[in-house]
Amino acid sequence: MFLRRLGGWLPRPWGRKKSTKADLPAPEPRWVDSSPENSGSDWDSAPETMGDVGPLKTKDSGTRRPPGAAPESSRDLKVDQLGSKRMDSLKRDKTASTIQEPARLESGGAIPKLDWDPVDSGGVKNLGVSAQGRLGTIGPEALLEKPGRRQKLLRWLRGEPGAPSHYLQDPEEYLQISTNLTLHLLELLATALLALCSRPLRAILDALGLRGPVGLWLHGLLCFLAALHGLHAVLSLLTAHPLHFACLFGLLQALVLAVSLREPVEDEETADWESEGQEREAKEQREGPGRML
């Protein structure tokens, strides 16, 4: 053991071997901000010098990050800033569109249709105006549905515009239906009374020997008086129960109106069928001699 130690102290002719590893420079002491605001404790209030401190605490985030994460955090911040700018621009566009909508409605202009455009380079979708909203206009006629036959009849009954043409061809003629119905009813009543009293009165006058012009005059006068008393009796009965007879008259008038309103349509259909039949007969007559040849 003594010889080995002695050999280590003796000089060697070839010299000592240099260490292949380069001496690393000593780490410089760094100042660490350990104030109570950042650390949250009073023990870190005094400044400290550390040899190898490592990553420092950032003021924005209380967590420690490695030194290689700095560029990534800067990229994240840029992306967040771009996204916030895009969202602000979208909010401004929405507010502008909401402000412009009532003005467009008042002026009667078409409102463009908003839809989503394809993704842009930033990866955010933008609102755009479709081609249909720019070119096409929505009119009131497109929103209204085509009225049916019942709706047309109701419009005609209410007197609203847009009723079918065949209902309004001759309005005076249709208005005379109710008056003609009353006239026909009174006429039927009077003729029935005259038919009941004419024959008996004529037989009585013949039995009395009243013939010739005097007998005819007396026959007419007596028929008038009999019809007048009969109408008075019938009208007194009708006025005694007006509600019942009014319902019967209304039902009868509704049936007459339904029949009279359908007549023009049926007449047009029959006229069309007759014209088609005549055309077919004419074609057959023309083709007949050609086939014979």
Swiss-Prot record:
Residue numbers carrying Phosphoserine: 34-35, 89
Signal sequence, start to end: none
Keyword Flavoprotein set for record: no
InterPro entries: DUF4661 (IPR029073)
Keywords: Phosphoprotein
Start and end residues of each stretch annotated as Disordered: 1-114, 268-293
UniProt KW Phosphoprotein keyword: yes
Residue stretches of biased makeup (Basic and acidic residues): 73-95, 277-293
Domain of life per record: Eukaryota
Protein name stated in the entry: Uncharacterized protein C6orf47 homolog
Organism: Mus musculus (Mouse)
Gene: D17h6s53e
